[in-house]
Curated annotation (Swiss-Prot):
SUPFAM superfamilies: ApaG-like (SSF110069). Pfam families: DUF525 (PF04379). Residues 3-127 form the ApaG domain. Coiled coil: none annotated. It comes from the Bacteria. GO terms for biological process: error-free translesion synthesis. This is Protein ApaG.
Length: 127
């Protein structure tokens, strides 16, 4: 995180359950999450890497780190946004994800864009 408001990136996440890609009898629950990353600062910046902590309903945690997102390292001008969708498989009906993106501004300043925890959950239906 960087306290200077010139280096600020906002992240919004919309998760959803993918019933057609899940096989609950085999302990496979598929979720997609759509992400909107917006440069809310004053300096253009590039997303360099991602860091995720994925926790299932049994408390098992997995760390996932990698370069960029969906094969890209998008550069965002002030006010510009980048959207992408990705997915995750859990062995339980619910879990959560949280993490951060490593960013580098055009002036060389490195900072972190936090991704607040969000819930992955199979929707309940009433019969």
């Amino acid at each position: 995180m960087h306290d200077d408001p010139r280096y600020r990136v906002e992240v919004e996440v919309s998760p959803r359950f993918l019933a057609h890609q899940s096989t609950p009898d085999e302990g496979r629950y598929a979720f997609a999450y759509s992400i909107r990353i917006q440069n809310a600062g004053a300096v253009p910046a590039r997303l360099i890497a991602r860091h995720w902590q994925i926790t299932d309903g049994n408390g098992r945690t997995e760390q996932v780190d990698g370069e960029g997102v969906v094969g890209e390292q998008p550069r965002l001008r002030p006010g510009e946004a980048f959207h992408y969708t990705s997915g995750v498989l859990l062995e339980t009906e619910q879990g959560q994800m949280q993490g951060h993106y490593d960013m580098v501004a055009d002036d060389g300043t490195e900072f972190i864009a936090p991704i607040a925890a969000f819930v992955l959950s199979v929707p309940r239906t009433l019969h």
